[in-house]
Amino acid sequence: MEKMTILETTDLKYTYPDGTLAIEDVSISIEKGKKIALVGPNGSGKSTLFLLLNGTLKPQEGEIIFHGKPLLYEKASLRDVRKSVGIVFQNSDDQIFAPTVYQDVAFGPINLEMPEEEVAAKVNETLEYVGLLELKDKPPHHLSGGQKKKVAIAGVVVMEPEVIILDEPLTSLDPVGADEILDLLNELNQFEKAIVISTHDIDFAYSWADYIYLLVNRKIIGSGTPEEIFRDPGMLKDAGLRIPMVLEIYYEIQKRNMASVNRVPKTVPEIVDTLKPPSLIWLDVPEGVKEGDKLDLGLYAEQLGEICSEGVVDTRVLHIHESGQAIVAVKRIRAGIGRVLIYDTDNYKLKEIKGLLASGDFDVVGAMGKKTKLIVESDNLKPDLTVGVIDKSILTALCGKNVLIFTGGGMVDHAVRRISDYCKKSGVRINVDVFNRETGEAQD
């Protein structure tokens, strides 16, 4: 993905008319396709910062740079930035005001003076995308909290923004509703939308975000990757934050010598992977090999001998003796890792689905994304996994079982990438195939 900064701020300061200081000296950067979390307590200035980012408020000091140019607070410039930077408020009722779902989502395109036919096409496409097309004529106040949140998101997505900002997007949602919103955000991110959220949920921010800003007492007191932020005790203390549950569990099992050291797991599958301590062997290594190097297994097949057939997937040099021999950590996996097949529901065919299910090749079936879930529900298919599908699929494959995942759109690439990233980090090889929409064949 091309690195491109869409929005950045330098030394922003904003004070409300009554003299209340909202933020000061705030500098952040938002890049294309990044997932960014602003973490901080209530009253720290997160909501005010969001209103500054799309030009709703104007800072008294500092400036906002939009595509490399200072934001001008005149009609044309504000129109451009508000089309490109959409905000979803914490309370959906503050944002939804039209008599019907359709009219609410159509508000933005109509204000852009789009032709009526184009408005209808965009709104219907967006409502179908978020799984609300069948509710388009309903009054929004008759909807559930999760449905209202989707209406608010749809009203932003229909404008085709580059940046989508969400204030506490998972607050007050039940686990299923929260998972559906998270699926939606991840899919939008696959289309290279920058997603910016505010949250109090440390575990969510740690596992989800690419980059984190800590906003405390109206100032940015720290920024970095989740690994950098949550492994810094001093920064966490200053921000009044605890460490994420995943890290807390890892540290406890590490203290008991039950886990590999110097790892930074972010998910349950990554914690599980730390519980596989390596074996130690001696190998003759050539000059130039250094401690910490990974070895090409093919070059040492003769020395490894039978060990190679026992599922060796990774080697790392721990120490090099003066004799030229090295102590090498050898990581193994047991035979029988399951596979994951992802069926792209953008070309859904019930006959194909029934054939896959009848084959008996799959032990567990999952479904991701609201649109996909509605499709499989309409055909009376009952997936085993509907929440946390990717992590649970990885864990299932590690137990030697095969998984079939139904999903569509950008979630196909998202699932492949997540599983592939796990494989790269862990050294465990899980075969992941996508069912080809054109030929009806699985492709790597």
UniProtKB/Swiss-Prot annotation:
Keyword Translocase: yes
Annotated GO biological process: cobalt ion transport
EC number(s) per entry: 7.-.-.-
Location of this chain's protein in the cell: Cell membrane
UniProt-annotated binding residues for ATP: G40, P41, N42, G43, S44, G45, K46, S47
Functional description taken from the UniProt entry: Probably part of an ABC transporter complex. Responsible for energy coupling to the transport system.
NCBIfam families (alphabetical): cbiO
Protein name: Putative ABC transporter ATP-binding protein MA_0394
Natural source organism: Methanosarcina acetivorans (strain ATCC 35395 / DSM 2834 / JCM 12185 / C2A)
Organism lineage: Archaea, Methanobacteriati, Methanobacteriota, Stenosarchaea group, Methanomicrobia
